[in-house]
From Swiss-Prot:
Protein's name according to its UniProt entry: Ribose-5-phosphate isomerase A
A single GO molecular function term of this UniProt record: ribose-5-phosphate isomerase activity
PANTHER family: RIBOSE-5-PHOSPHATE ISOMERASE (PTHR11934:SF0)
Pathway: Carbohydrate degradation; pentose phosphate pathway; D-ribose 5-phosphate from D-ribulose 5-phosphate (non-oxidative stage): step 1/1
Active-site residue numbers: 103
Role noted for this protein: Catalyzes the reversible conversion of ribose-5-phosphate to ribulose 5-phosphate.
Reactions the enzyme catalyzes: aldehydo-D-ribose 5-phosphate = D-ribulose 5-phosphate
Record has Isomerase as a keyword: yes
A Pfam family that the UniProt record links to this protein: Rib_5-P_isom_A
Organism of this sequence: Haemophilus ducreyi (strain 35000HP / ATCC 700724)
Subunit structure, interactors included: Homodimer.
CDD domains named among the record's database cross-references: RPI_A (cd01398)
GO biological process, one term: pentose-phosphate shunt, non-oxidative branch
Amino acid sequence: MTQQEMKKIAAQAALQFVKPDTIIGVGSGSTVNCFIDALASIKDEIKGAVAASKASEDQLRAMGIEVFNANEVAGLDVYIDGADEITPQGAMIKGGGAALTREKIVSSLAKQFICMVDSSKQVDVLGSSFPLPVEVIPMARSYVARQLVALGGSPEYREGVVTDNGNVILDVHNFNIYEPLKMEHTINNIAGVVTNGIFAQRYANIIIVGTAEGAKIIK
């Protein structure tokens, strides 16, 4: 079974957490694309969605699903997204698609974070197989890079990428993260950092793993 097929299995299983007559939070990325495709089958049962990226907004609208601004809602029942890496405790690295800041904002509005992954994204230690994205205000890029080196990482400027917020991304390689919550706060305290791709403060409440045997749900 291909990775794409496993993503579709996880995305289909996530529909069970969507309650009728609610506005849901939707992330971004390849697994979320599969979820939005699946969501179209029950679009008449929900009020709409708040999207974490322009790309997801466009896809939702193309499916005929109403898109709300984050400032229009007081809270969300669920936020549904993928991850680049996830631990058994629900801590994640996200931001491969450069939408990490908006993903943090929308996920913070939700009572529950539902994370959809295929089995290749499961790790014991964050940073083991995927670099950590850090969104940075452009003028602070070099300063932030030096601070990340001091923390033990190897930052690389993601050339040609500008976030939906007009900022740049540094991808931090060779960076095993043994204390995700502490490191999330440490990096966010560097002047010029908008946010980083560690999701430990807002961890996943439910993990859906797409496998060849079907969807495995971890609560």
